[in-house]
């Protein structure tokens, strides 16, 4: 089978490689010429994805994967098209379909009868049927569900472990009609493998969600649930700080009961998924007060971490504060919606001099993000740990001459390594 994958980003490229490893002929499409050139050389354009470098080199050398900037031409040669183009939201939470609409137009230009189109980008409910189907029909002159198949099948993977997650989680498929759904199921059964999951009541594999709307909502529901759960954990954590309770012990105790699944609190909820997809849901359901309140609560956590620091050292004016972590989580070079932005902004509003460190970023990259790099070993008044990189776990007060306070936003540091320093964690009282 010949397959076009549109957008070779941190999800799209591993998907293209996965399809190619199953023996299919894959054309990867991207608007970035540099990305296309690197892929055609078998070089991964971004670091941090397990096995991608090895697998990419293998499938390119075997002739199973090529890349191009000509999406319409690639689609015209393909039996199936998979779209993983990013969808953004503006400051008011309104989806910005610019990139998605442009990619959809290019796909429609090259579309031929009998092709399957699968959107994997997370979308508001109804988008596949009500926005993209008419757009494709208008440009191509073909009828959705009759001349071509159209489905929504959300990506459910985490960057850094895409190949493992593709095997681990059921692939959800829903089409605009039954024929499209069946075509989608047949396609994904041909391109994916699945781990045995005895914990599931339905066998792991490709799952029929019935409609594109159900499939769209399934992805929004699973990610919005996580955001709401984390917000609840964060509110528990803030209360625990004032009551001198260790919330980590409370959550562990609560979760020993099988119906309790409280997530872990922390300084921020970042990345391309959890901070964004609840806003898609709110676009569909603007009266969802629980979802809106949860999003606002999580967005306020970086400022809460700065409040803890202010409680520990007093006025932050002219204080040197090192923020550890540009990435939104440990082990991944990705700054999308990272807590570093809210943390730095809040510190600057309090008059602090802010320095930023991350072992995965060069000083030049940190500067390009608008931050001042921290020089390892230089004196600071305080430290806020924002990302749980493994490199940070063994840090001691000797690494930060003159440090008077530590705020551990991810609870990975050892208080014993900071004897004599005011040490605070999210969800725990003062550990002086």
What annotation goes with each model-predicted range?
Residues 1-432:
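Structural/interface elements that position substrates and couple domains in central-metabolism enzymes
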């Amino acid at each position: 089978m010949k397959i076009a994958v549109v957008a070779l980003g941190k999800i799209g490229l591993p998907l293209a490689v996965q399809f190619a490893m199953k023996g299919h002929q894959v054309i990867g499409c991207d608007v970035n010429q540099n990305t296309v050139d690197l892929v055609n050389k078998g070089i991964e354009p971004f670091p941090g994805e397990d096995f991608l470098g090895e697998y990419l080199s293998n499938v390119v050398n075997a002739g199973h994967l090529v890349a191009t900037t000509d999406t319409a031409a690639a689609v015209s040669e393909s039996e199936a098209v998979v779209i993983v183009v990013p969808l953004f939201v503006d400051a008011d939470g309104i989806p910005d379909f610019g990139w998605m609409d442009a990619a959809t137009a290019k796909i429609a230009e090259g579309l031929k009868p009998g092709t399957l189109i699968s959107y994997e980008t997370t979308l508001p409910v109804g988008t596949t049927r009500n926005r993209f189907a008419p757009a494709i029909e208008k440009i191509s002159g073909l009828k959705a569900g009759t001349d071509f198949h159209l489905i929504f099948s959300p990506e459910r993977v985490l960057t850094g472990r895409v190949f493992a997650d593709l095997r681990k989680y059921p692939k959800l498929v829903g089409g605009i009609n039954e024929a499209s759904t069946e075509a989608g199921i047949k396609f994904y059964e041909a391109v994916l493998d699945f781990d045995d999951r005895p914990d599931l009541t339905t066998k792991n594999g490709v799952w029929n969600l019935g409609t594109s709307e159900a499939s769209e909502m399934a992805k929004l529901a699973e990610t919005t649930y996580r955001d709401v759960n984390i917000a609840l954990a964060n509110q528990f954590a803030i209360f625990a700080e004032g009551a001198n309770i260790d919330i980590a012990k409370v959550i562990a105790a609560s979760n020993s009961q099988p119906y309790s699944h409280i997530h872990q609190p922390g300084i921020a909820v970042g990345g391309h998924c959890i901070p964004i997809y609840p806003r898609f849901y709110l676009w569909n359901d603007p009266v969802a007060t629980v979802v809106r309140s949860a999003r606002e609560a999580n967005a306020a956590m970086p400022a809460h971490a700065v409040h803890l620091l202010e409680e520990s050292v007093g006025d932050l004016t002219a204080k040197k504060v090192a923020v550890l972590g540009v990435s939104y989580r440990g082990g991944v070079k990705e700054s999308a919606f990272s807590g570093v932005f809210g943390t730095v902004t809040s510190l600057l509003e309090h008059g602090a001099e802010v320095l930023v460190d991350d072992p995965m970023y060069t000083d030049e990259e940190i500067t390009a993000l608008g931050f001042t790099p921290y020089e390892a070993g230089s004196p600071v008044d305080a430290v806020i740990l924002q990302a749980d990189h493994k490199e940070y776990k063994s840090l001691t007060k000797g690494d930060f001459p003159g440090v008077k306070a530590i705020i551990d936003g991810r609870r990975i540091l050892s208080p014993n390594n900071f004897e004599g320093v005011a040490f605070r964690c999210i969800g725990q009282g003062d550990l002086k």
